Curated annotation (Swiss-Prot):
Protein name according to UniProt: UPF0102 protein THEYE_A1950
Domain of life per record: Bacteria
Lineage: Bacteria, Pseudomonadati, Nitrospirota, Thermodesulfovibrionia, Thermodesulfovibrionales
Similarity section: Belongs to the UPF0102 family.
A GO term for molecular function: nucleic acid binding
Source organism: Thermodesulfovibrio yellowstonii (strain ATCC 51303 / DSM 11347 / YP87)
SUPFAM superfamilies from the UniProt entry: Restriction endonuclease-like (SSF52980)
Gene3D superfamilies, per the entry: 3.40.1350.10
InterPro entries to which the protein is assigned, alphabetical: Restrct_endonuc-II-like, tRNA_endonuc-like_dom_sf, UPF0102_YraN-like
Amino acid sequence: MARIELGKEGEKLAIDYLLTKGYKILEKNFRTPFGEIDIIAKDGNFIVIIEVKRRLSDKFGKPELSVNYTKQQKLKKLALYYISMLKKEYPVRFDVIAINDKKIEHIENAFF
């Protein structure tokens, strides 16, 4: 399976999972001048910025480990851009959804 195809399928699995948990999906593949946020959702009062990582095996490490410090800093910048567009302030949370084959691990508050 091609990398982009794998990623898109992973995002669909993540969205389906989030909907079953009661999240409201606000944006998918939200593009900014600085990059893209995989999923933006609402969980209670929180705006949740969600990075989805999918791998078919752990051969190159667990998927969640690829959300390193540099990626975290980029996601924070992207979140600021999104939040600045809203007319109301919301608390923000950063989650990671790691998918290995079809197993989903949801890491809430993965970083701040």
